[in-house]
Amino acid sequence: MLLHIPTILSRTHATSMQERLAAANWTDGRETVGPQGAQVKHNLQLPETSPLRQELGQEILDALARSPLYFAATLPLRTLPPRFNRYQENHQYGFHVDGAVMSLPVAPDHTPASLRSDISCTLFLNDPDEYEGGELIIADTYGEHEVKLPAGDLIIYPSTSLHRVAPVTRGMRIASFFWVQSLVRQATHRHQLLELDTAIQSLTASNTDHNTILRLTNVYHNLLREWSET
């Protein structure tokens, strides 16, 4: 399921992040991937240890927590703290697949933890007219889908998808990216639950008979109970 979620960040908030990132110390993005990824990755990335990455990442997590659509679509169990990248002229990232299992930051009790990447997320931090190229291109069984969204908007898609970032030919593309392990492993099941949840919300808003809504809500929670992993 490829889903555009608008206005995770307000325009003012996205602009504020751009301004703070402008003064950041960026590193070569190839330092964060293995030999295969390094052959096709040409961008800059904010270091994992950067206090700014942690500060802005927490702001994004707080914003996501305020989005009912994001929660309904992802049903998050674990989220990798948001990271940040920058594409300047001639930067690009060729087709690649995200790692299936990722390490989470070590907990205070030093217990190691990991995340299964079910959902890949890109949050755009500047507007499309500020750069040329730089489209996120996601390949699935229906072909290739180009994504280039306004500042503050989020795209989510299955982490099983091959994807790339097209070459930037003018300006600069700035974004945050992160991964989610969902309560529901299968993308088709998540899609069905989102469709059902959306229908329930629509019926509730139209003052449909309460018993009808209750029965559908019961179906939703029973499906979630059957499909969820905690």
Curated annotation (Swiss-Prot):
EC number: 1.14.11.-
Pfam families per record: 2OG-FeII_Oxy_3, PKHD_C
Single Gene Ontology BP annotation: intracellular iron ion homeostasis
InterPro entries found in the cross-reference section: Oxoglu/Fe-dep_dioxygenase_dom (IPR005123), PKHD_C (IPR041097), PKHD_hydroxylase (IPR023550), Pro_4_hyd_alph (IPR006620), Pro_4_hyd_alph_FE2OG_OXY (IPR044862)
PROSITE patterns linked: FE2OG_OXY (PS51471)
Enzyme class: oxidoreductase
Molecular-function GO terms, alphabetical: 2-oxoglutarate-dependent dioxygenase activity; iron ion binding; L-ascorbic acid binding
Binding residues for Fe cation: 96, 98, 163
Residue ranges of domain Fe2OG dioxygenase in the record: 78-182
Note describing how the cofactor binds: Binds 1 Fe(2+) ion per subunit.
Residues where 2-oxoglutarate binds: 173
Keywords: Dioxygenase, Iron, Metal-binding, Oxidoreductase, Vitamin C
Cofactor needs: Fe(2+); L-ascorbate
PANTHER family: PKHD-TYPE HYDROXYLASE YBIX
HAMAP family: Hydroxyl_YbiX
Name listed for the protein in its UniProt record: PKHD-type hydroxylase PD_1553
Source organism per UniProt: Xylella fastidiosa (strain Temecula1 / ATCC 700964)
